[in-house]
Amino acid sequence: MSGGRLFVIAAPSGAGKTSLVRELLAREPNLRVCVSHTTRKQRPNEVDGRDYHFVTVPAFEALVAADGFLEWAKVFDNYYGTSRGALAAAFGAGHDVILEIDWQGAQQVRERTHDHVTGLPGCTGIFILPPSRAALAQRLRGRGTDDAAVIARRLADAVDDMTHHAEFDFVVVNDDFGQAVAELQEILAGRGDALRSGRRALAPLLADLLAPPSAAPSGGGGPPPRL
């Protein structure tokens, strides 16, 4: 498998990962995103093949049985997975590739990119954080697509998602959208050392985001990534 570099981007739902990736794709002509498969119900503003490949549970399970996924996971009772074929096609064309996946998928990708049988390059992991717990809760409620029980469940699960931030090479805070995009471009260009060395400055933010729900401000938290 020839081609460019592999970047894995994960975040709790509501952190703005998808918007950031779309802006990166608009600015970086050699960058491609590997569109995931999912059994989740398609939302009104989503396009099949652009946002996800929407498939049935039997179709997804058939791909799992055929070893058709580089990684897959079950999140919020729905399956998500990255197709080996789609990834191979992007690398075959010489593109750099982004995977928008959750921390579970990122763990699988890290393991398999060190497996010489797959022929995959090593991957660079990037975790997106919201600027605060309250901001994350507000973004989730602002979607208007989920009821209060679903939002509460996602907010409760966000703490667990964000405890995995240290497993990634870089952490980017999506407070100012333009700045976050610029930081991602620096990482893609191989100039992310300043971000790596500045992670200690995130300690106060992480203390807020990772506090138990009872100790957190009333604003809330967030959920698993690929929603």
Role assignments for model-derived ranges:
Residues M1-L6, P29:
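Extreme N-terminal, non-catalytic leader segments
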Residues L25-C34:
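Post-Walker A helix-loop "phosphate-sensing" segment adjacent to the P-loop in P-loop NTPases
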